[in-house]
């Protein structure tokens, strides 16, 4: 976390961000940077040094008119994990990251499809493809209407009681190609109980997702939003905001050897804008559908 603070201080400066933008187009020396920025050489050199000290750029000696120093960008992206020590050491929590292709039931309507890290799975816009054995390799799945359902193993220790269950997943709407303004009413069910509906604002593309493979055209869906559903004794919450009065007691978690999760768009949804679900090798977040199930000691 200390390193993240140091890097944030370095890039929290307009001149240094502009230097990184210029270096995204290719290597430059300080004179070239100063000219493009319209800044004095000395000011540019100071900012270059700060970026170099933070390991955000590298400086190399290259032959030219004599020998000159040339700066290059060292990273295309920076990821900061915001997990605290208390989260990392949390006890009495069962965490399962479910691959998006491991659903046990589905009912989907076109436009629909599944995509692995390297190719399409089955045929596009053909619901039969959702039953292909290769679906387990899916890193992106999408459909306009319907649902997919997952079953997590129920690992609550005998004699213990669950007090909170949480699901996190990267998700967005499903439009032709992509469309930022394309609302979709997405509903979540746990153990057959409707938890609530969230209206996703759009289907996001035009800018490549951090983990989206290069072969996947930029005009298609690229990334989603990371959403967190949480159910405890106080009710059901989406990103910390209560969305229903369903409590964890209503889910009867101790009655079955599994915990079911259904994600879908209802037939009568006001905004029937579909769903895209992302795996770790598509979108912006390296995860499937994570369940955190907390129980007493």
Residue ranges and their predicted role:
Residues 161-180:
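A short beta-strand element within beta-rich, extracytoplasmic domains
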Residues 4, 8, 66-103:
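Conserved segment of winged-helix/HTH DNA-binding domains
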Residues 55-64, 69:
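Beta-hairpin "wing" of winged helix-turn-helix
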Residues 128-143, 199-254, 271:
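Extended, solvent-exposed segments with strong compositional bias
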Residues 178-190:
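Short coil-to-beta strand junction motifs in C2/discoidin
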Residues 19, 32-35:
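A short acidic, leucine-rich amphipathic alpha-helix
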Residues 25-29:
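Short capping segments at the starts of secondary-structure elements
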Residues 35, 52-53:
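Alpha-helical residues within the helix-turn-helix
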